[in-house]
Amino acid sequence: MVRTAWVADDAFLTMRTVDNFVNGYGLRWNILERVQIYTHPMWMFMLSGLYYFIRDPFIVFYGLTLLLSMITIYLFGVKFTKSPAKAVLGFSILIFSKTFIDYSTSGLENPLTHLLILIFLYTFLEKDHDLRTGFWLFFIASLVAFNRMDTFLILIPALAWILYENRNIKMLVYAALGFLPFMFWELFSLLYYGFPFPNTAYAKLGTGISSLLLMQQGMRYVIDSIQRDPVTLFVIGLSIVLALRSRNIHIILVATGIALYFIYVIKIGGDFMSGRFFSALLLASAVLILKTTDLNFSRPNLAMLGLIVALGLSASNPDVRNHITKNVNVRNYGITDERAVYFRTMALINLDWKTRRPDHIWVQQGLEHKAKGRVLTIGPANGLFAFYAGPNLHIVDTHGLGDPLLARLPPYHVSHFIIGHFFRAVPEGYWKYKRSFGNQIKDKNLREYYQKLSILIHSEKLFSKERILTIWRFNIGYYDYLLNAYLADTAIR
């Protein structure tokens, strides 16, 4: 894991917010707007806590991800591998899973997700389901949602069972108390940003792309994972089969959560990062396999182990044989082996620790913008560029990830897309607005829509009556007619 450690460009999208937050600009990506570009609030706060003391993004990324991953692996071994046979089987699954190894670092939230879900599974599968355990399960689930909202889907069946087992008011109260961390965050997000979900959710999910096209892309994501990392999907499928055969309701409920999240990943079109959304499922599936297999080196266990090793070694570029990811089919239907892309410049073993800056064109471009004192640019958001350009550069992100208006406009070229990278046309006059900070958007409907949106993202008075009312109206779709009128006028659908 140490020799394969790397950092993804997307991690620096969050790090720009972290840097602005620590330096007193608030939880903002562009310092003049309150916009949530990160999808993992808990992870962002953990990065911020360490970055406050250590102003080196790579030490923060590597230190935190490796620490959390080591804790996860230790707990996995101590709590779920009760015999040498289970230890060999369990650790073989983790070692031969490219997805798990790749996203146990990367600078993204996956290591924290892994740890929280492992703690949840141990509590749910090993403890008596009394009120106290119920509280802790909902508390851990709250942290899972706080870390990354959609991963909460994995835990829904288990949580529903806890409520069913303890059908009384006390359990509902304990569940509500346990879920307070996430509810507090949602309240903060609503009041600070104006919306309960990250801006990236609106940019990625509100594209107007048909469900059929997204599901087709989701199936490509599954096929891509099978090609690059056959162990992960095999283990996930095997765990569900073994769970059903076990007839243990608790194990079946965990398997149901795994299946639920797997279907969700297909439905949203997967991701552009190969395997990223399957890493937590792999860990949960490994736990289920260990819970449903014998303690000794039986023939089924040996057969399973042999198949996992064979599949792992048959991968196009298995991590266990070579830490250097070769550029093999890096982009397949818009799905990328991200570690292959960034390993040369962003890997722990390749980083220049004297300069502590990766030798990457986006870093150079960011530093050039900063040196020239540029305050505005337009283009797709790249994490490295945005971070190294500094806080004074305002980036109009044509992907919409960091721009609250473009996130709510449909992309163009919807028949050819990369998940999470949907290009938007910049409305006429919007560029002038960003230069002058006066609303010069040409279309009257879009101009009025953005005027209302500006109350949420620019107003200094967070709790003014006008802003609270506008937040309410935006979240019930009150202003959608303005957006629809603009789209009708410009024939953008």
Set out the residue ranges of the language-model regions:
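Membrane-proximal envelope and lipid/glycan-remodeling enzymes
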Residues: 1-493
